[in-house]
């Protein structure tokens, strides 16, 4: 008490003027008055009231103790800066004084001390200070409070303090009580927050007080003050206590308090804060306003660091579930009809970021199944706020990949319930949920159009069970019409429900209603774009603008698939008004056409070929383009640069990518990554101008030009931004954590790219990896390698890629695409491939270290892992050594992401890594001998990283030390040299059949296989085959020959059997190319491969000879011969081998004669080939023979000499010598000689044929026919076509003059031992098939009498005519059509149509003149070909049935 409370005139002052103490006054009164117990009790109560009303303990002590207690000032106890603090007085002294005072007053010491401390707390909170922070203490106040609480702890420890009384006293000063002071009391154990709150008499008031203070605290935290740490700790403690006490099933409350109060208060406070935040967001809170700061801070309490110390997850889950319920149900002001109209504005990207951040924090604790189940429960039991419900659905499908299936299942149940009992609520919910999820794009959920078609577009639809269900569906759809967006109405009209015919009126009524609504909205269903987007902000796009977007998208789909999009084809039929009026004009905009046709030109031409562009419109377009080319200046002026409308979206995309990158290094921001990726997806769509529903784009296979990848500028910029961002994000994330602890950001990022721009991303990757790889920096290599891994992770959801040549024609999965993009040809490409493979494999092993090897391998193609092994063997000699257990190394991703990455060290570390060594045990990723050969064949020696010597040493090691001894199960050869040669030859053939071998050569005939890079491999093959030949000589006993098939011919036979048979151009070219490669390989190997090493009398024709003869007869005759002869190289090679083998026998001359005699029947083409090349072949054979034998050439070789000499003499002016035997050989020699002589010198010499033998003339006529057909078939033939005609005509004239039958040449069969077997083995099959063409080409030279005289002539003529017609129908006569400029010269004889016409007229005139016996076999001819020409067939049948007519002389002449 102060001194002013004691009046001067009172009796408290003695006569001497001394002022008496209050104790003396009280004592005096006690002495004067008689003790009264009742009065004493009242006095005690009054004293307590007085003490509670006036809590100035300092004054009280002064009054009680007098001058001695002036030093007992409590203000000095709590004043930490006072030099007198605790100098003379301890807590025990003050406590003793309090006890004394309490005993004098008759008041419990706990009550007295509680009132004193509460008063001091109030004084500290109201002390003048920088009170800009209404909930936090200043530094000075905090120090004073700390001292006071130490004193209070002493009192508590000595049972001198009443908590309940203290709480009651505190609430009396509630207006001045600061929240931080309450927190300190709680933290230091003076009084818990629970006790304090439950002591308040008014629960609503205390909730309001806490709410106000928490709002102030949140605002204070967002202000970034110097006390932020304290504020953050306060908020965390309060929220944790609220959650534990409010959402714990069995609250551990004290017996002295009511157990219901605390949960009520805490739940009330939490609910007040959430409702305040939701209302603020609904009202449109301003950015950086105080309210915005409060909401942002409060939503932050749902993160892990705020609630991290909550041990049990059950209260936390109950709290989050309760919060979600409040979010979904608070203030349900919107109706379902409002949701139908407005839900497009509630997509994830358009929802307020604060609300989406709250959703994401709730998702951390609750699984997708729990969230969907909770949403279902809330919708079934309570009124909801549709905006927040649907924005929650959007967040759910964006953040949880598995949510799509969960929502689909739930919607399916809703639809089943709706149609089962006509529940309108279930129907509305299902439609709203599906539409909302579809707004988030194809990577999150299927499109609404696809869902609607799947649900109602078939007989299995929900509506197909009964008429009641149909009526319910169309009633529902009709009720939606006034609220529907035009987009949804268009979907319902274009993809209507499947309805039985008898209920068709229900559908037509609805469509009429929907079209009326669209008309009211001034939207035409005919003008709807081909690629519509139901999530676009606007209701409708102008038809012209939509058409431009449709054209761009259609061209993009065409470019990536190579086919006209199905959407365009459907529009050309079912939506023709829009297609003709808008799409085609937008597509056919006149422009200066590029010199190299681009995708737009190719697309237009494809539509033109498909008759999808009206001729008049196409003609107008071509004229306009021509006019633009003629006036380039005007065209340039007319083409204005489009306003760069993509700049703003591009900037927004850049900003969104920057925000994502900033989150990479902040662990606290991990929960916002999925939202940021969703925003990036939205920004990306805006940049690319994709206003279509991406999921409706029918890209089942991506078409990618691997050699000339091209991108539109807008796509190029967007994809570069994405790839750069991915690489930067990876580097940023790797600086903080290894790949396995970086979270799902990369997978989410890649999924966004796959959903929006996968074709463009793959095209850009093709440009970077295949064409610019060596110039990429280390961060780019690492980033793109990680991207490849994550694309492989999503392989099952990605379409295949058709890269065209040089890759196989079949579609490739995306991981295998990277194998095609990484080439190993030059030094630079080898080292780049090593870097990329090292980075990709290392990242995969780190990222999925806790998963199985199957998962590791599934993310990368086996080809990429094999290339890494190939490069390690090739570039590092250390890798060729076997590994020991001590060599096994650990793998770290960290050195790779550093700027100065040591790739060699990283590669060797990966090579010796234990897990990688385990992966290599998998059969499909282990580098085999065949894999090694395919990769080695691609190396360009002139640009190789190895020198010639190093490359040779490497080949020797790889073949003889590594793959040859390795087991076949591990990809080796089991030590079998022949198996090694077989695999090598197959690899050579495979490589040269693929177009990879022609990438760098204009003319594939210049070098072996079009490449010089194979020479070293061919040298290894030569060495290995030479070794095999030596082994064979050692194995076969003297006097015997090997009987088994040579492995090379076995390879050729198997490969030829696998090729497509037939006479199509493609099959023929493929077979010809294969045979040319066989021939080149044979020419590089010893000639003994063709004939064997020696001939023996017991078995003169070796198995190898037989195999070579078969190869010549069956294949080379058709594809490797020209004009009846093989090429010079293979012919000379055979004869060299023949002499070598024969010279090793006992009688070389006899062996040569025997073999060549057998050739006449087994392989005559070899002899005709020798005749052609004899001038160059003879000196070589003669020199070799004379070197080993003194005798003249063997007789069969002399026959070849004589045949050539006869031909030369025949064409000389002198008299010709008689033709040697055999006749066919002399005829062949004469034919080849005639081909070398000019036409004017031939006519006179051919008159000598009258003196030649009949058989020679017949053979010569056949060879001439072959020459005639060759002249037709070969455009650059050295034989002039008129000359070939004249030669054939001259020989035919001679035959007719001498009445020699030649018709058998057009009826050759293998059973004909005299002509057929011989000539059919010389002429290619194509020539014999075209004999009908040759027959009727000589029609004008047929003799009239011979045609009637020869009984077989009509049969042959009809047979040739029917075969000619069949050839024409099959298109085979196109190969013999004359080149331009020659048809006039040939007088129409080479034109198939004219030829057939003349042949037909000839037969119709011939048939009536032929005798009855000529028709004996007509029925056989017409049995299966009578329908080729009904008129000719009828004439034949009519003449066959008629009686012989004696007056045949009245018929007109045929010739």
From Swiss-Prot:
Changing residue 1110 to P: In FANCA; loss of function. Its main location: nucleus. GO terms for biological process: DNA repair; female gonad development; interstrand cross-link repair; male gonad development; male meiotic nuclear division; protein-containing complex assembly; regulation of CD40 signaling pathway; regulation of germ cell proliferation. Phosphorylation is required for the formation of the nuclear complex. Not phosphorylated in cells derived from groups A, B, C, E, F, G, and H. One of its GO terms (cellular component) is nucleus. InterPro entries: FANCA, FANCA_arcN, FANCA_helical, Fanconi_A_C, Fanconi_A_N. It comes from the Eukaryota. The modification Phosphoserine is found at residue 1449. It is found in: Nucleus; Cytoplasm. Keywords: Cytoplasm, Disease variant, DNA damage, DNA repair, Fanconi anemia, Nucleus, Phosphoprotein. Pfam families: FANCA_arcN (PF24783), FANCA_CTD (PF03511), FANCA_helical (PF24781), Fanconi_A_N (PF15865). A motif (Nuclear localization signal) lies at residues 18-34. Belongs to the multisubunit FA complex composed of FANCA, FANCB, FANCC, FANCE, FANCF, FANCG, FANCL/PHF9 and FANCM. The complex is not found in FA patients. In complex with FANCF, FANCG and FANCL, but not with FANCC, nor FANCE, interacts with HES1; this interaction may be essential for the stability and nuclear localization of FA core complex proteins. The complex with FANCC and FANCG may also include EIF2AK2 and HSP70. Interacts with FAAP20/C1orf86; interaction is direct. DNA repair protein that may operate in a postreplication repair or a cell cycle checkpoint function. May be involved in interstrand DNA cross-link repair and in the maintenance of normal chromosome stability. It is linked to Fanconi anemia, complementation group A: A disorder affecting all bone marrow elements and resulting in anemia, leukopenia and thrombopenia. It is associated with cardiac, renal and limb malformations, dermal pigmentary changes, and a predisposition to the development of malignancies. At the cellular level it is associated with hypersensitivity to DNA-damaging agents, chromosomal instability (increased chromosome breakage) and defective DNA repair. This is Fanconi anemia group A protein. It comes from Homo sapiens. The gene is FANCA.
């Amino acid at each position: 008490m102060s001194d002013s409370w004691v009046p001067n005139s009172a009796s408290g002052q003695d006569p001497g003027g001394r002022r008496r103490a209050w104790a003396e006054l009280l004592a005096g009164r006690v002495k004067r008055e008689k003790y009264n117990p009742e009065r004493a009790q009242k006095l005690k109560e009054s004293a307590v009231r007085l003490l509670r009303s006036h809590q100035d303990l300092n004054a009280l002590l002064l009054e009680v103790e007098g001058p001695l207690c002036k030093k007992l000032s409590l203000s000095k106890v709590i004043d930490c800066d006072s030099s007198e603090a605790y100098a003379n007085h301890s807590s025990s002294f003050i406590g003793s004084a309090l006890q004394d005072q309490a005993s004098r007053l008759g008041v419990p010491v706990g009550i007295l001390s509680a009132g004193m401390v509460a008063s001091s707390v109030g004084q500290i909170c109201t002390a003048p200070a920088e009170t800009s922070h209404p909930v936090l203490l200043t530094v000075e106040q905090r120090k004073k409070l700390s001292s006071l609480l130490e004193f209070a702890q002493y009192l508590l420890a000595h049972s001198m303090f009443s908590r309940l009384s203290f709480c009651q006293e505190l609430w009396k000063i509630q207006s001045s009580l600061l929240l931080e002071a309450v927190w300190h009391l709680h933290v230091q154990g003076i009084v818990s927050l629970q006790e304090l709150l439950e002591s308040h008499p008014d629960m609503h008031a205390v909730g309001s007080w806490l709410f106000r203070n928490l709002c102030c605290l949140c605002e204070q935290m967002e202000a970034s003050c110097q006390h932020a740490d304290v504020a953050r700790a306060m908020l965390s403690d309060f929220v944790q206590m609220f959650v534990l006490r409010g959402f714990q099933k069995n609250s551990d409350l004290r017996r002295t308090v009511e157990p219901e109060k605390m949960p009520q208060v805490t739940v009330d406070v939490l609910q007040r804060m959430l409702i305040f935040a939701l209302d603020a967001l609904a009202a449109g809170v301003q950015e950086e306003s105080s309210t915005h700061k409060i909401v942002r801070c409060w939503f932050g309490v749902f993160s892990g660091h705020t609630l991290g110390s909550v041990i049990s997850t059950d209260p936390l889950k109950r709290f989050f579930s309760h919060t979600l319920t409040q979010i979904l149900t608070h203030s349900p002001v919107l109706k379902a009809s409002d949701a139908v109209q407005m839900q497009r504005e509630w997509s994830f990207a358009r929802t307020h970021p604060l609300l989406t951040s709250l959703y994401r924090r709730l998702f951390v604790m609750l699984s997708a199944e729990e969230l969907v189940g909770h949403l279902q429960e809330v919708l079934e039991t309570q009124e909801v706020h549709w905006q927040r419900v649907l924005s929650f659905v959007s967040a759910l499908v964006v953040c949880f990949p598995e949510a799509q299936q969960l929502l689909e299942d739930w919607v399916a149940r809703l639809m089943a319930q709706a149609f089962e009992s006509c529940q309108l609520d279930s129907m509305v919910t299902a439609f709203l949920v599906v539409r909302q999820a579809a707004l988030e794009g194809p990577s999150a959920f299927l499109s609404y159009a696809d869902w609607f078609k799947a649900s109602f577009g078939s007989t299995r639809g929900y509506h197909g069970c009964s008429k009641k269900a149909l009526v319910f569906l169309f009633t529902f759809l009709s009720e939606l019409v006034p609220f529907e967006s035009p987009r949804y109405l268009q979907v319902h009209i274009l993809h209507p429900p499947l309805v039985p015919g008898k209920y068709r009126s229900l559908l037509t009524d609805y469509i009429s209603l929907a079209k009326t609504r669209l008309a009211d909205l001034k939207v035409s269903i005919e003008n709807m774009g081909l690629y519509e987007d139901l999530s676009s902000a606007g209701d409708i796009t102008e038809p012209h603008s939509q058409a431009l977007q449709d054209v761009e998208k259609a061209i993009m789909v065409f470019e990536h698939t190579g086919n006209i999009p199905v959407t365009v084809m459907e529009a050309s039929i079912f939506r023709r008004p829009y297609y003709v009026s808008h799409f085609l004009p937008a597509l056919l905009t006149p422009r200066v056409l590029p010199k190299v046709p681009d995708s737009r030109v190719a697309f237009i031409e494809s539509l033109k070929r498909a008759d999808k562009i009206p001729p008049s419109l196409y003609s107008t377009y071509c004229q306009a383009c021509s006019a633009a080319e003629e006036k380039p200046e005007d065209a340039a002026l007319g083409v204005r640069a489009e306003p760069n409308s993509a700049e703003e979206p591009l900037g927004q995309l850049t900003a969104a990518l920057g925000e994502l990158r900033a989150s990479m290094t902040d662990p606290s921001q991990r929960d916002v990554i999925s939202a940021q990726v969703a925003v990036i997806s939205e920004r990306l769509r805006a940049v690319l101008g994709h206003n279509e529903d991406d999921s409706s784009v029918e890209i089942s296979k991506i078409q990618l030009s691997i050699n000339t990848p091209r991108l539109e500028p807008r796509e190029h910029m967007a994809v570069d931004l994405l790839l750069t961002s991915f690489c930067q994000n990876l580097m940023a994330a790797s600086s903080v954590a290894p790949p396995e602890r970086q979270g799902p950001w990369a997978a989410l990022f890649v999924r966004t790219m796959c959903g929006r721009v996968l074709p463009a991303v793959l095209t850009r990757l093709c440009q970077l990896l295949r064409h610019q790889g060596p110039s990429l920096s280390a961060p780019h290599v690492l980033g793109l390698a990680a991207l490849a891994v994550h694309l492989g992770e999503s392989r099952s959801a990605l379409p295949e890629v058709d890269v065209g040549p040089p890759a196989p024609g079949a579609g490739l999965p995306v991981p295998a695409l990277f194998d095609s993009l990484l080439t190993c040809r030059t030094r630079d490409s080898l080292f780049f491939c090593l870097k990329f493979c090292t980075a990709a494999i290392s990242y995969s092993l780190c990222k999925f270290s806790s998963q199985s090897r199957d998962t590791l391998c599934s993310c990368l193609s086996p080809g990429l892992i094999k290339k890494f092994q190939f490069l390690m063997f090739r570039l590092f000699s250390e890798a060729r050594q076997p590994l020991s257990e001590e060599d096994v190394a650990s793998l770290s991703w960290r050195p790779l992401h550093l700027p100065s990455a040591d790739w060699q060290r990283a590669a060797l570390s990966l090579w010796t890594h234990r897990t990688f060594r385990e992966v290599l045990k998998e059969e499909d990723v282990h580098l085999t001998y065949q894999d090694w050969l395919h990769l080695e064949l691609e190396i360009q020696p002139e640009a190789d990283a190895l020198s010639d010597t190093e490359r040779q040493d490497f080949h020797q090691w790889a073949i003889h030390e590594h793959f040859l001894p390795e087991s076949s199960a591990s990809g080796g050869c089991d030590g079998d040299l022949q198996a090694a040669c077989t695999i090598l030859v197959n690899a050579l053939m495979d490589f040269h059949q693929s177009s990879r071998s022609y990438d760098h050569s204009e003319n594939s005939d210049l070098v072996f296989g079009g490449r010089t890079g194979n020479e070293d491999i061919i040298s290894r093959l030569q060495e290995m085959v030479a070794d095999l030949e030596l082994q064979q000589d050692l194995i076969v006993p003297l006097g015997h020959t090997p009987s088994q098939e040579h492995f090379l011919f076995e390879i050729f036979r198997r490969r030829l059997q696998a090729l497509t048979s037939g006479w199509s151009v493609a099959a023929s070219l493929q077979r010809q190319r294969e045979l040319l490669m066989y021939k080149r390989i044979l020419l590089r190997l010893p000639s003994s491969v063709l004939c064997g090493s020696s001939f023996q009398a017991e078995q003169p024709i070796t198995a190898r000879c037989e195999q070579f003869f078969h190869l010549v007869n069956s294949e080379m005759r058709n594809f490797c011969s020209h004009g009846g002869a093989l090429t010079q190289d293979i012919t000379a090679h055979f004869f060299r081998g023949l002499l070598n083998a024969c010279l090793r026998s006992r009688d070389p001359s006899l062996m040569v004669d025997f073999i060549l005699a057998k050739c006449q029947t087994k392989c005559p083409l070899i002899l005709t080939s020798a005749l052609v090349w004899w001038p160059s072949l003879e000196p070589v054979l003669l020199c070799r023979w004379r070197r080993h034998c003194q005798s003249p050439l063997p007789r069969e070789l002399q026959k070849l000499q004589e045949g050539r000499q006869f031909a030369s003499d025949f064409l000389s002016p002198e008299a010709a010598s008689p033709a040697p035997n055999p006749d066919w050989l002399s005829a062949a020699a004469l034919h080849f000689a005639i081909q070398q002589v000019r036409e004017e010198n031939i006519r006179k010499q051919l008159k000598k044929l009258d003196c030649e033998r009949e058989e020679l003339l017949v053979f010569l006529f056949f060879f001439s026919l072959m020459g005639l057909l060759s002249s037709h078939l070969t455009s650059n033939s050295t034989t002039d076509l008129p000359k070939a005609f004249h030669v054939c005509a001259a020989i035919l004239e001679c035959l007719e003059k001498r009445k020699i039958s030649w018709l058998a040449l057009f009826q050759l069969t293998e059973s004909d031992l005299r002509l057929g077997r011989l000539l059919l083995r010389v002429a290619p099959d194509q020539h014999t098939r075209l004999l009908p063409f040759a027959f009727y080409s000589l029609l004008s030279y047929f003799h009239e009498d011979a045609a009637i005289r020869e009984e077989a002539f009509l049969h042959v003529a009809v047979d040739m005519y029917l075969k000619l017609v069949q050839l024409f129908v099959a298109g085979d006569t196109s190969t013999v059509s004359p080149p331009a400029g020659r048809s006039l010269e040939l007088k129409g004889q080479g034109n198939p149509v004219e030829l057939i016409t003349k042949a037909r007229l000839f037969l119709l005139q011939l048939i009536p003149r032929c005798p009855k016996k000529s028709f004996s076999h007509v029925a056989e001819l017409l049995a299966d070909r009578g329908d080729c020409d009904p008129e000719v067939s009828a004439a034949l049948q009519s003449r066959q049935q008629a009686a012989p007519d004696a007056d045949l002389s009245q018929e007109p002449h045929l010739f």
